[in-house]
């Protein structure tokens, strides 16, 4: 085919893709069912991971919860079991038929596994255990994350490595563990819970930003690889929220006059937006929508212009109060241990 004709056809496809994206933004697509599907969630013991578990439980997925903390993981599992019990009660919800929701003929279950996702041997062995005890995995939610809370020159090398391993490298291990069967079946969904700090950065959290940039790069490259393999049954969703009020960045502050218009996100809102994206096979979701604009402006504006905007918003040193709190907390712990 003549290259000019092919270029013209490509431009038509690009325009059509833009039109369809706008159409989906205006008219909410129908959500797919995940009932009965096996869903692995890393970092399920609290924060967003726990909320993801509850949302998937309400949709009657079989949950496989991974966390390094056994007690927190079991707490999440009990919340999931309570949701299952409420759904099994025919009087708990009103439905369309006779005022009662019909209960599906299968009984979803929840399984818990304690492991460190930063240790690839542990990830691979636990994944094999999941396949034996639960079955093949349909959905993988790479959610586990940590933050060191130190300025670069004050951060121990071990904490930098830990941040990179958990926030980025673990995605490689979990994906390598579960993707082969997804490719074989041409069915599956991989979700990367990243951060807006993986799209644009700020001072004081170099290790965290690098880990999230890495996770996003991995996700995007993997998405292209799956597209190149023509496995259209495997979906990918990238979740990039603004700062979420889970306590991970407690103390982070932008300019006080701006903060009412851009407060930390409620975790419940963040997860509901992410669930909507996952269940409609949306490739990427940024919350709030202004994150899309900030990322676009970062791509086209000179660095000096970005610095001016950061200083106006108070985003250049927004992490400093958080870092100071973490340092004070560590000093207090060291003082207590020295008594």
Curated annotation (Swiss-Prot):
GO annotations under biological process? retinoic acid biosynthetic process
The UniProt record gives the binding positions of substrate as 195
Q: Where does NADP(+) bind?
A: 40-64
GO cellular component term of the entry, any: endoplasmic reticulum membrane
Q: Mainly resides where? A: membrane
Q: Which UniProt keywords apply?
A: Endoplasmic reticulum, Membrane, Microsome, NADP, Oxidoreductase, Signal-anchor, Transmembrane, Transmembrane helix
Identify the InterPro entries for this entry. NAD(P)-bd_dom_sf, Sc_DH/Rdtase_CS, SDR_fam
Topological relation to the membrane, as annotated: Single-pass membrane protein
Which GO-annotated molecular functions does the record name? all-trans-retinol dehydrogenase (NADP+) activity; oxidoreductase activity, acting on the CH-OH group of donors, NAD or NADP as acceptor
Active site (catalytic residues):
208
List membrane-spanning regions.
Answer: 3-23
Catalytic reaction(s) noted: all-trans-retinol + NADP(+) = all-trans-retinal + NADPH + H(+)
- What subcellular compartments does it reside in? Microsome membrane; Endoplasmic reticulum membrane
Q: In which pathway does it act?
A: Cofactor metabolism; retinol metabolism
Stated EC number for the protein is 1.1.1.300
Function per UniProt: Retinol dehydrogenase with a clear preference for NADP. Converts all-trans-retinol to all-trans-retinal. Has no detectable activity towards 11-cis-retinol, 9-cis-retinol and 13-cis-retinol.
Its family remark reads: Belongs to the short-chain dehydrogenases/reductases (SDR) family.
Q: What is this protein called?
A: Retinol dehydrogenase 10-A
């Amino acid at each position: 085919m003549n290259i000019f004709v092919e270029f013209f056809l490509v431009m038509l496809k690009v325009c059509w893709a833009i039109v369809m994206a706008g159409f989906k933004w205006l008219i909410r697509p129908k959500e797919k069912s995940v009932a009965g599907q096996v869903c692995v969630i890393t970092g399920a013991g609290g924060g967003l991971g726990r909320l993801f578990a509850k949302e998937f439980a309400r949709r009657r997925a079989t949950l496989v919860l991974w966390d390094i903390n056994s007690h927190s993981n079991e707490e999440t599992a009990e919340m999931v079991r309570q949701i299952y019990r409420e759904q099994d009660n025919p009087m708990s919800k009103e439905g369309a038929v006779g005022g009662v929701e019909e209960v599906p003929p299968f009984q979803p279950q929840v399984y818990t596994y304690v492991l460190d996702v930063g240790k690839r041997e542990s990830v691979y062995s636990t994944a094999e255990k999941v396949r034996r005890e639960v079955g093949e995995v349909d959905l993988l939610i790479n959610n586990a994350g940590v933050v060191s809370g130190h300025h670069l020159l004050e951060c121990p090398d071990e904490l930098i490595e830990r941040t990179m391993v958990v926030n980025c490298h673990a995605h490689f291990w979990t994906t390598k563990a579960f993707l082969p069967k997804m490719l074989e079946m041409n069915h599956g969904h991989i979700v990367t819970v990243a951060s807006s700090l993986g799209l644009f950065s700020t001072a004081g959290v170099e290790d965290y930003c690098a880990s999230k940039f890495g996770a996003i790069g991995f996700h995007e490259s993997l998405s292209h690889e799956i597209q190149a393999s023509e496995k259209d049954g495997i979906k990918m969703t990238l979740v990039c929220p603004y700062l979420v009020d889970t306590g991970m960045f407690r103390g982070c502050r932008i300019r006080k006059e701006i903060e009412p218009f851009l407060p930390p996100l409620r975790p419940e809102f963040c997860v509901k937006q992410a669930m909507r994206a996952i269940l409609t096979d949306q490739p990427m979701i940024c919350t709030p929508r202004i994150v899309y604009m900030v990322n676009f402006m970062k791509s086209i504006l000179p660095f000096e212009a970005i610095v001016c905007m950061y200083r106006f918003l108070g985003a250049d040193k927004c992490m400093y109060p958080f870092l100071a709190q973490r340092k004070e907390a560590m000093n207090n712990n060291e003082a207590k241990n020295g008594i």
